[in-house]
Amino acid sequence: MTQDSRIEQVFALQRATRTVRKSEGARTRIARLKDLRDAIHSRIDAIEAALHADLRRAPNGGKEGEIPAVLGEIDLAIGQLEQWMAPQPVPTSERFQGNQTFIQYEPRGVVLLLGAWNFPFALALSPLVPIVAAGNSAMVKPNELSPATSKVVAEIIQAAFDEQDVAVFEGGVEVAEALQQQPFDHVFFTGSPNVGKMVMAAAARHLSSVTLELGGKCPAIVASGYDLVDAAGKVVGARFNNAGQLCLSVDHAWVPSAVIEPFCQIVGAVIEKMFFVDGQLQLERLPRMINERNFDRVKGYIDEAVARGARIVLGGQCDRETLTIYPTVLVDVPLDARIMREEIFGPVLPVLAYDDLEQVTEQVDANGKPLAMYIFSDQQAFIDEVLLKTSSGGVTVNHVFMHYLEPNLPFGGVNGSGMGRYHGHAGFIELSNSRSTFIQGGTVTN
């Protein structure tokens, strides 16, 4: 059977069994989630090895990041699913008193899930949790740029699910294009804005709803008087995690001009402690760039910025043989340089000086609405002004990633950084059709 034929056959099977899944209660959905959890637990070492093979992720990196993120989503859904599935009463307006109004949550149907390469385990399986919890079926394509992890994800899905409920398809762009020929009820995509546009255009042919988790230039903004040691340490952690190949990474940092030098010194000291021993970069501590194309892209950003007057205060070395870009810090970067117009997605941190907050908010607004924003300030007026004059998918104040890590907060982007929300209850709602129901007279008898 050809890949195209299998796609058509599985799609037809899942569509034909939609009513069966819709009739199933919380117990059946919870059983599927438990099967997924068991399949993950039995392959922890294989997941770790795959992440190292694909990205040179540090030993135990998966156990400290991607794996608990997925397991946490599963456990939360198992514990809350009965409550989430319950019809939600809606107050009846005065005009319609005596009638019954409520919202029923029904599955969207057959969902296409397209995973990403940068966190290839979590971004293939974390969205699958609300898909299953909401009673949908899914056809999952892990990302081909992380082939070892794609293989393990496929093994997990095949072990946990019947193909009529969740099926997996490995392969390259041609597989993604073949999948998108089918009229899915919903499409869930994580990746770049450029590819997101193509996914949305393909979905539009069938009027499929979409969830797009994209990215953008996520800024860190440090206020005057804020603890530089605290801010610098957290910015470094958020910029160089996974070698900057993270949609939530700090893309660049705005710092008051009076303290930019000490800020950069602290950043340098933190980087030395995190990634170096006796002045030598420890490759096992820094993931590699995913491929040569992305290596060349990020190196090109550095070269173009330096050619236009930017100054390297740390790093700058690039080893194409190992796909390693040393943690790099730039200052005096022109705002119209490519590195300031495009999402970096690599281990490079431009540090920008400012004297007037208006300058910062105007530039953030000019770059589009990012997926995340990080504000470091002890002044409520400063925080309020930034929030008023900018927009982003989410924001964390005086820390990094926390709005993503809190499972009860909806996570997602806005406009160029994405659309739709997931995590926890928000994910269940996103992957459900909220069906408005009105019963004349308030009751229906058999």
Give residue ranges: language-model regions.
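N-terminal Rossmann-like NAD(P)+-binding subdomain of aldehyde/semialdehyde dehydrogenases
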Residues: 1-102
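Residue-level signal for inorganic ion chemistry
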Residues: 29, 74, 135, 166, ...
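Rossmann-like NAD(P) dinucleotide-binding subdomain of oxidoreductase/dehydrogenase enzymes
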Residues: 91-230, 354
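Conserved C-terminal structural/oligomerization subdomain of aldehyde/semialdehyde dehydrogenase
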Residues: 25, 324-446
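Structural signal for hydrophobic packing residues in well-ordered secondary-structure cores
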Residues: 18, 22, 37-40, 44, ...
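ALDH superfamily catalytic-core signature
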Residues: 161, 194-334, 357, 397, ...
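Residues at or immediately preceding the N-termini of alpha-helices
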Residues: 7, 26, 44, 228, ...
